[in-house]
A protein has these predicted regions:
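Extracellular/periplasmic, surface-exposed regions of secreted and cell-surface proteins
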Residues: 1-262
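Short acidic/glycine-rich loop or secondary-structure boundary segments that cap or lie
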Residues: 227-229, 270, 284
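C-terminal segments of large proteins
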Residues: 263-268
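Structural flexibility/helix-modulation signal
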Residues: 272, 276-278
């Protein structure tokens, strides 16, 4: 956190500067397999099971595997391509893959977290609870469906084209909890969902290919559409949306959106004014409804 100026100034340097070490333990088991038939058809798959002290103790989630499967078809090795005399087509391959990958947020813990400090005024020890325990802490999962193609023409032009859909679930986001538990009525839990759809194109052309010299031009383009599909907790104060945009999300918006008031100009006294949630022009200090702010970018 950020300490107040008075608090920081009055503390000795040895109390402010500190070094700490953080250690986590992992154990993994994985399996990979692949098979290619007649240099034309290929299948591959992988499975991985991982355990870490960052996961919760709930047995329902502890041993969920991450896995992927894929297939490819090397069209240029088919007889009908060779019989057609398509010498200009050096390589053309189609690919299809599907899999589930995982990510673990090391800022969260399945255990009750607290930090210890000494009061500036009483010199007494203070312990502040940070996060409640979470036995269901688990992977942030992303399922990816990808269709792609690779090609080479005339021995000089190479490229690839991919279309994908990525759906992320069990994302760590703020979740509403019983206010009587404390923690500002919210806690981080695997409760968010997000979707990405996009395309990627990559091209490369060899203008000059010599033993000791080459000249190549490359081109890449990509498009991605992102949307938050599920979030359990939405703030009730517009200021929270602007102060902490990376901790507060609105369903239907994009990830890491930035929010702002709709500016309505200056009042007769020179003070700034904005539009509230109903479109009325009022003083900026009076607007606290989250529906009064809009997404202005990322």
């Amino acid at each position: 956190g950020v300490e107040g100026g008075l608090y920081s100034a009055l503390r000795r340097r040895s109390e402010v500067l500190n070094v700490y070490e953080e250690m986590h333990r992992y154990v993994s088991a994985y399996f990979n397999a692949g098979y290619t038939y007649d240099t034309r058809y290929s299948l591959n798959g992988s499975v991985r099971v991982e355990q870490a002290d960052l996961f919760g103790t709930d047995p329902k989630y502890r041993y969920r595997p991450l896995w992927s499967v894929g297939a490819s078809w090397n069209v240029t090795n088919e007889r009908f391509v060779k019989d057609a005399g398509m010498d200009w087509l050096d390589m053309f391959k189609l690919r299809l893959t599907y899999g589930i990958t995982g990510n673990v947020d090391q800022t969260s813990s399945p255990y009750l977290l607290a930090y210890y400090l000494t009061s500036l005024y009483t010199n007494s020890p203070i312990t502040t609870l940070q996060t409640p325990p979470n036995s269901s802490l688990r992977w942030e999962k992303t399922s990816t469906l990808n269709f792609g193609m690779d090609f080479m023409l005339l021995g000089r032009l190479t490229g690839s084209f991919d279309v994908y859909r990525r759906y992320s679930s069990d994302l760590l986001v703020n979740k509403s909890i019983d206010p009587s538990l404390g923690f500002d009525g919210k806690a981080r839990a695997n409760n968010g969902e997000m979707q990405n759809n996009g395309v990627e194109l990559s091209l490369s052309y060899d203008w000059l290919k010599k033993r000791d010299m080459s000249f190549t031009t490359s081109f890449s383009a990509a498009y991605n559409k992102n949307e938050i599909k599920k979030v359990d907790y939405e703030p009730t104060d517009a200021l929270d949306m602007m102060r902490e945009p990376t901790s507060n999300y609105k369903m239907g918006d994009t990830y890491n959106s930035l929010y702002a008031y709709r500016y309505a100009g200056l009042t007769a006294t020179g003070d700034p004014s904005v539009y509230d949630e109903n479109g009325n022009v009022i003083s900026i200090e009076q607007v606290r409804n989250v529906n009064a702010v809009v997404c202005v970018g990322q």
